[in-house]
Design a protein with these regions (language model features):
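Surface-exposed extracellular loop regions of Gram-negative outer-membrane beta-barrel proteins
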Residues: 156-181, 189-192, 278-291, 384-390
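N-terminal, post-signal peptide beta-strand-biased segments of exported outer-membrane/organellar beta-barrel
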Residues: 22-120
Length: 488
């Protein structure tokens, strides 16, 4: 079945390529080899968040391209992992991305993909999309592996008329995972999103604004087939706490969320030089319901995400760039727990009050640099250097039980790329390394029973996040044109 899905994605890529020939009206004089080099360039996407505006994405590249990636990875994280995400994962997938110039005024762009994944040794989390719904997952003391599949489709259209540009994008992601061994979670998630943007030229810059919308839903059910019966499941509240009243056999849950957001930014008309800047804010409201208890709303999670970046880029000479980027972000996640009265008959009791739940704030500031020289017809060597430094301040507070975990972290990384070409063959060697340094770690967990599995998981996560460690990696790639329109 997985092979069939990959073949389908290959056919989609070939179809997109054929449509480019049919509908692309403008003259695209860039050679295939130059397109391959430029789409893989760090400079192309270095400005980052500004390209989320579908109107400004009109100017992402001045040429037509389609890229197909068949990829696979195995990652053994060992102790350097959150227990709720597992310590090993195996992935295989295929991704198609395309940008088509229909005419001098019109652009269409999109992506599609499929991914098969297996996570191992997942503890105290029987849901998917951990980063989105954490800490409000359903968990148990057994856990195990999780197998899953993801499908996604995104498409957009942008048009220019005089000084104005407008664009629209839409996307859908479907994800499911399961375990065919007790306990047997079966999760399905749907993620629908839209964005609308507009841009206006002011001299040598373009001013852009955008709004976006997201609708998310996850349905989960845990079953048991073993003769010895079921294991108790718990609805986690964070920092080792769970909703005691509904612990036991409430195995069906539903997460539903809506997000609204917007951004404003500026982009230079010549995207290869000058300053760009953007500020965005998103707010998402999500609730968790017990589907086997008359869809009783157990709790709510409200997330506010404020981001901004400023990028300066300069073209030193043809195909050589220098750039610096400053990123900052502030995320606040606030939980609200619903308290219900005594149950009676088929009722689980009336809502009598609410109580503030766990609050998480994540402050981040990052500085990145870039020097890159692309391959050209006149040279056989190229390369790039991308240094990056990030400061994080993560504060998790659960005031109702006087528990907290506060962490400060400094991350540094360096990516280096070397390019070489010999006639039609192009070789890429890339090395990256980083260091995660804990600056401070404070926590207080009164009343925590360290004999419990959930408490041991919490303490293991704190040990991981408050530790310091390094990482290294290498990548080798070869490119060779196999036909006039295709590069392998």
């Amino acid at each position: 079945m997985m092979l069939i899905r990959i073949i389908i994605m290959l056919l989609i890529a070939l179809f997109v390529e054929s449509r480019q020939e049919a509908f692309g009206q403008t003259t695209d004089t860039l050679s295939l080899s130059d397109k391959v080099i430029r789409t893989a360039s760090f400079a192309t996407g270095f400005r980052g968040e500004i390209w989320q505006n579908p109107a400004l994405y009109y100017y992402y590249t001045p040429y037509i391209w389609t890229r197909l990636d068949v990829n696979g990875a195995y990652h053994d994280k060992g102790k350097a992992s959150l227990k709720q995400e597992g310590d090993k994962d195996t992935r295989i997938g295929v991704d198609v991305n395309s940008f088509v110039i229909l005419s001098e005024r019109d652009r269409v762009f999109g992506s599609a993909g499929y991914r098969s994944e297996k996570q191992e040794n997942v503890l105290w989390n029987e849901n998917i999309d951990w980063k989105l719904i954490a800490p409000y997952v359903t968990g148990d003391s057994i856990g195990g592996f999780l197998k899953g599949e993801t499908y996604y489709f995104n498409g957009g259209y942008a048009s220019e008329s005089g000084s104005w540009t407008w664009g629209i994008t839409g996307g859908y992601r479907a994800f499911h995972n399961y375990r065919d061994k007790d306990p047997r979670p079966r999760n399905t998630a749907s993620d629908l999103s839209f964005a609308l943007g507009a841009g206006y030229r002011l001299g040598t810059y373009r001013l852009g604004v955008s709004v976006d919308f997201r609708l998310y839903q996850q349905k989960s059910e845990i079953s048991f087939l073993a003769d010895k019966g079921s294991t108790s499941v718990y609805h986690m509240l964070g920092l080792g706490m769970d909703y005691v009243r509904f612990a036991g056999n409430q195995t069906g849950t539903k997460h539903q969320g809506i997000r609204w957001g917007g951004s404003i930014g500026i982009l230079p008309v010549d995207t290869e030089k000058g300053i760009s800047a953007t500020v965005s804010i998103d707010r998402m409201s999500m609730d968790k319901k017990l589907s086997n208890a008359n869809n009783l709303t157990l709790l709510e999670l409200n997330t506010t995400d404020l981001k901004g970046n400023v990028t300066w880029m300069r073209e030193l000479q043809q195909a050589e760039h220098l750039a610096v980027k400053l990123d900052a972000g502030y995320i606040v996640r606030k939980g609200m727990e619903n308290i219900y009265g005594e149950a009676g008959g088929s009722s689980y009791g009336a809502l009598i009050s609410t109580s503030p739940g766990m609050k998480v704030t994540n402050s981040r500031i990052a500085v990145s640099g870039l020097w890159e020289k692309l391959l050209t017809d006149k040279g056989v060597w190229g390369g790039a250097i991308v240094p990056n430094i990030i400061y994080h301040r993560l504060e998790t507070d659960y005031n109702a039980v006087s528990r907290f975990v506060h962490l400060s972290v400094l991350e540094s990384s360096l990516r280096a790329r070397l390019l070489y070409q010999k006639r039609l063959l192009r070789l890429t060697a890339e090395a990256n390394g980083g260091y995660y340094a804990n600056l401070s770690a404070e926590y207080s967990l009164p009343g925590l029973n360290t004999a419990k599995s959930s408490a041991q998981t919490l303490l293991a996560n704190i040990d991981y996040l408050s530790d310091s460690y390094s990482m290294v990696g290498i990548r080798l790639q070869g490119d060779y044109p196999i036909m006039k329109q295709y590069n392998l």
